[in-house]
Regions:
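Local sequence-structure signature of Cys/Sec-based thiol-disulfide redox active-site neighborhoods
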Residues: 1-40
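Alpha-helical elements of the RecA-like P-loop NTPase motor core of helicases
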Residues: 23, 27, 53, 82
Length: 103
């Protein structure tokens, strides 16, 4: 069973652990403190098929990486990173500062 995390972001990310483009997005998020968001491994032994079905329902194809924001699927690692740079970096800095304050 997946442990529930406190969400800091209103998006979901679908990925495969061996996909270099997925790793590019995941590494960018980690490096920029964009953390605590729902992510779905579409190759997971337990929930992979369910995750693939969910991805297909939202985007009409099973392609990763895929970020779902406001119910819309965004593909391509460069597009996802560009969107994150424009829309997430300021909030990521604020979230990190709050976490540091609470230590």
């Amino acid at each position: 069973m997946r442990k529930e995390i406190k969400r800091e972001w209103d998006f979901e990310l679908f990925f495969k652990p061996d996909c270099p483009f997925c790793l590019k997005v995941l590494n960018y998020f980690k490096e920029n403190d964009i953390i605590k968001f729902p992510s779905y491994n579409i190759e997971d032994v337990v929930s992979g098929y369910e995750n693939q079905d969910k991805l297909y329902e939202v985007g009409g194809k099973v392609q990763v990486p895929c970020m779902v924001i406001d119910g819309k699927a965004m593909y391509e690692s460069d597009d996802i990173i560009a969107y994150a740079k424009e829309n997430f970096l300021e909030k990521a800095k604020e979230n990190k500062a709050k976490r540091e304050e609470n230590k």
